[in-house]
């Protein structure tokens, strides 16, 4: 197992609970004589921290591991910035759900110590890359760990588009939009739209129509190496948007083409050894527990 000596910390802004957890994490890491580097944005709200600071972009170059304190949204943003550096990322949950940031604050010292001592699991989660092209020229591009979503933006009108997979025409559709999700993102927006849950180890992409104006529109799961092309109808009166993880947005025009494919670099997501994906689903999604045993 890798030895982690230079630890970066990213924290969600605007939360006193996050700041308290970052301070606690900092003290714990320093007590273990590790080199701690704060992302510059969180460092600005921690006066007197006395630590090295770095931009998020540079953290991937100077750290052995990055710990994200926040919710899944915080980890999504960190993942897009750090995946290209092949650096392990660990999440401490200070959000509402915690599918990706799976260490509870009350077990911080115990679980982080286990990871630092080499007792951990690594999952390689792939990302999607999206590009919007207009008249054969790229006008926007972004990455997503969860999903790439075509949606009407502020408009309430439906979008008309054509879908192609690996150059083959699949369908034309009129809908509120289209969600293209990774296995990681299958428990996010895609799940709310009626998509299936996919295990993170699957090499697959799920395509989920949003409120299609048809009785036969259903999600479809395709090979993870597929290249998707979405062509926005030239006859539309609105300018839809493409969103990557709900955080980066691009405005499309009628006739634009959106391509979505797997990104070469993957996120190295660290979990404690007792991590159980099905337990996470059961806890976060409210699945039923085991039937209670009993006597006669």
From Swiss-Prot:
The active site is at residue 72. The keyword Lipid biosynthesis does not apply. It comes from the Bacteria. Its cofactor is a divalent metal cation. It is an enzyme of class 2 (transferase). InterPro entries: ATP-NAD_kinase_N (IPR017438), ATP-NAD_kinase_PpnK-typ_C (IPR017437), NAD/diacylglycerol_kinase_sf (IPR016064), NADK (IPR002504). It catalyses: NAD(+) + ATP = ADP + NADP(+) + H(+). GO terms for cellular component: cytoplasm. GO terms for molecular function: ATP binding; metal ion binding; NAD binding; NAD+ kinase activity. Disulfide bonds: none annotated. Its EC number is 2.7.1.23. Belongs to the NAD kinase family. Involved in the regulation of the intracellular balance of NAD and NADP, and is a key enzyme in the biosynthesis of NADP. Catalyzes specifically the phosphorylation on 2'-hydroxyl of the adenosine moiety of NAD to yield NADP. This is NAD kinase. It comes from Pseudomonas fluorescens (strain Pf0-1).
């Amino acid at each position: 197992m890798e030895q982690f000596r230079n630890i970066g910390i990213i924290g969600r802004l605007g939360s006193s609970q996050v700041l308290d957890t970052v301070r606690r994490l900092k003290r714990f890491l320093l007590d273990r004589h590790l080199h701690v580097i704060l992302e510059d944005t969180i460092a600005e709200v921690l006066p007197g921290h006395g630590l090295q600071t770095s931009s998020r972009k540079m953290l991937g170059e100077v750290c052995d591991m990055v710990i994200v304190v926040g919710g899944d949204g915080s980890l999504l943003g960190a993942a897009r910035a750090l995946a290209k550096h092949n650096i392990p990322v660990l999440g401490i949950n200070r959000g509402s759900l915690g599918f990706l940031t799976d260490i509870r604050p009350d077990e911080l010292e115990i679980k982080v110590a286990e990871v630092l001592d080499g007792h951990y699991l690594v999952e390689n989660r792939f990302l999607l890359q999206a590009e919007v092209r207009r008249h054969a020229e790229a006008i926007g591009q972004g990455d997503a760990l969860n999903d790439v979503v075509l949606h009407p933006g502020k408009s309430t009108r439906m979008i008309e588009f054509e879908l192609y997979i690996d150059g083959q025409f699949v369908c034309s559709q009129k809908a509120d939009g289209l969600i293209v999700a990774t296995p990681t993102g299958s428990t996010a927006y895609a799940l709310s739209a009626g998509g299936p849950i996919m295990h993170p180890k699957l090499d697959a992409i799920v395509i989920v129509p949003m409120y299609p104006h048809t009785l036969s529109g259903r999600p479809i799961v395709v090979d993870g190496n597929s290249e998707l092309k979405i062509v926005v109808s030239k006859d539309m009166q609105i300018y839809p948007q493409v969103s990557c993880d709900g955080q980066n947005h691009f405005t499309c025009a009628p006739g634009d083409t959106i391509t979505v494919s797997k990104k070469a670099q993957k996120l190295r997501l660290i979990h404690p050894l007792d991590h159980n994906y099905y337990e996470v689903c059961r806890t976060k999604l409210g699945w039923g527990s085991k039937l209670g045993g009993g006597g006669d």
